[in-house]
Amino acid sequence: MEIKDQDKAANPVAKDEMYEETVKRLKKLGAEPAVIGEVARTVSVGPLEKLLNLARANSLWPMGFGLACCAIEGLMAANMARFDLARFGYEVMRASPRQADVMLVCGTVTKKAAPFVVRLYEQMAEPKYVIAMGSCAISGGPFVDSYSVVPGVDKLIPVDVYIPGCAPRPDAVIHGFMKLKEKIINPEVVKRGDER
C-alpha cells in the first residue's frame, strides 16, 4: 500500500490526465479499458479485428511494380533520406508477392503487362491493398488512347488509394501511405472500390 500511496503522491494529477488520455484513445479505436483495479491503466478490451487492423496499418510491406518513370521519380525518392518513408515503417520493399501487403503500381500498364499485374495481385496473401501511383496507373495518362494501354489499373484489380501526379512528388507518396493507413484502421468508414 505504501508504494501506491507514494506513487500517487508524486504527481496524482498527471497520472489521472494520462489515464484519461489513454481511455480516450482506446475509445476512439473502439476498445474499452478493463476495469480491474490498477490493471485498468495497462489493459484494454475491444474487438480483436480493430487491434489487428491497427497492427497491420503500422507494419505494411510494400511490393513495387514499377512500370515507368513514377517508380524512379516518386517511389525511390520517397525512400531517400530527405523524405524518409522508413519513419512510417514502409521502407522494406518486398520482391515476392507472398511477403507483401501492399502492391504499388507505378506507371503505364500495357495490355501485355496486365496478366502479370493480375497474377502478382492474386499471389498476395489477404488482406492485400493496392496503390495506383501516377496518372498512367490511374487512368492511362497521356497514352490512354493507345491501342496497347490499359486505361487505369482499376480495370484489372481493385485499387485502395490513388496518388495523382506525373510523377507524384515524394510527399504525395507519403500522403498516400497515410491515407491507406487511415483506411486500414477504419475499414467501416472508407469502402474499397469492389465493395461499393
UniProtKB/Swiss-Prot annotation:
E.C. numbers: 7.1.1.-
Q: Which UniProt keywords apply?
A: 4Fe-4S, Cell membrane, Iron, Iron-sulfur, Membrane, Metal-binding, NAD, Quinone, Translocase, Transport
Q: Kindly give the membrane topology term recorded for this protein.
A: Peripheral membrane protein
Q: Does the keyword Protein biosynthesis apply?
A: no
Annotated Gene Ontology cellular component terms: plasma membrane; respiratory chain complex I
- GO BP, one annotated term: aerobic respiration
Q: What is its main location?
A: membrane
Catalytic reactions of this protein: a quinone + NADH + 5 H(+)(in) = a quinol + NAD(+) + 4 H(+)(out)
Q: For this protein, what does the record note about how its cofactor is bound? A: Binds 1 [4Fe-4S] cluster.
Per its UniProt entry, which superkingdom is the organism in? Bacteria
GO terms of molecular function: 4 iron, 4 sulfur cluster binding; iron ion binding; NADH dehydrogenase (ubiquinone) activity; NADH:ubiquinone reductase (non-electrogenic) activity; quinone binding
Q: State the needed cofactors, names only.
A: [4Fe-4S] cluster
Q: Where does [4Fe-4S] cluster bind?
A: 69-70, 136, 166
Top-rank EC class of the record's enzyme: translocase
Read off the Gene3D superfamilies from this record.
Answer: 3.40.50.12280
Q: Where in the cell is it found?
A: Cell membrane
Q: Which PANTHER family match?
A: NADH DEHYDROGENASE, NADH DEHYDROGENASE [UBIQUINONE] IRON-SULFUR PROTEIN 7, MITOCHONDRIAL
Give the UniProt family note: Belongs to the complex I 20 kDa subunit family.
NCBIfam families xrefs: nuoB_fam, PRK06411.1
Job of this protein: NDH-1 shuttles electrons from NADH, via FMN and iron-sulfur (Fe-S) centers, to quinones in the respiratory chain. The immediate electron acceptor for the enzyme in this species is believed to be a menaquinone. Couples the redox reaction to proton translocation (for every two electrons transferred, four hydrogen ions are translocated across the cytoplasmic membrane), and thus conserves the redox energy in a proton gradient.
Subunit info? NDH-1 is composed of 14 different subunits. Subunits NuoB, C, D, E, F, and G constitute the peripheral sector of the complex.
Name this protein carries in UniProt? NADH-quinone oxidoreductase subunit B
**Organism lineage:** Bacteria, Bacillati, Bacillota, Clostridia, Eubacteriales
Q: Which gene encodes it?
A: nuoB
